[in-house]
């Protein structure tokens, strides 16, 4: 399709200028939002959830996103959630960034994955980034990409690891020094690697999804990155505010949500 468009554009091009069609590079946002509500002000949890979902989808489709140079405004997003229904008392929301990397199967290839935003380092012990599963030459199990920061907290190295299942917290590192990571510039570089298959196939393309936590929750679609909010990959949970609802005036059994639920407790991207 791209070549056909280029041929058509040549008919109208100024002499000496060759039109170039660039593939879109998407930077996806995934949010995890715990939304508290007063049960006395809403007939059901489903009503609150439906209204929130609708408002977030409208924001995801708006012109504030879906373009180069777009900025996800964290405080505005929180307000959209809070204002969705009068019963909502607050929300705790964390943000993650994702790139979908097309894999060149059965060939030795290097991959540079730019996010255009600084990465947050939650653990100096590693596992700050997450990936979906894939297979590489020489290893019979699914592998995932992990990172370990250097002491300067500016860059680090990449490794491959395996898990018995995606929910496991007991990784086995099977190959070290397979690439490097620049936390400041938000760039992940995989050394030449032979990828044989990927767990995820999107629109007929073998894809590795790579997820990182931004240093700032205001995420920018920098330069050639087209910013989108992936509602389908986000998680919205509506929770009873037991204090506001009068069920627990002393707050002794109040459900507290972490503001740092970056990876949803997982080492990998399911």
Please report, for each region that a protein language model flagged, where it lies by residue.
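Surface-exposed interaction regions enriched in Ser/Thr/Asp/Glu
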Residues: 166-270
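Short amphipathic alpha-helix segments
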Residues: 3-12, 79-81, 159-166
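Flexible glycine-/small-residue-rich
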Residues: 35-39, 115-117, 212-214
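Carbohydrate-recognition loop of C-type lectin domains
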Residues: 1-64
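Short beta-strands and strand-coil junctions in structured, solvent-facing domains, enriched
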Residues: 39-43, 83, 87-89, 188-190, ...
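Surface-exposed intrinsically disordered loops and tails
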Residues: 146-170
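An aromatic-glycine-centered, glycine-rich loop/turn in mixed alpha/beta architecture
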Residues: 22, 47-138, 145
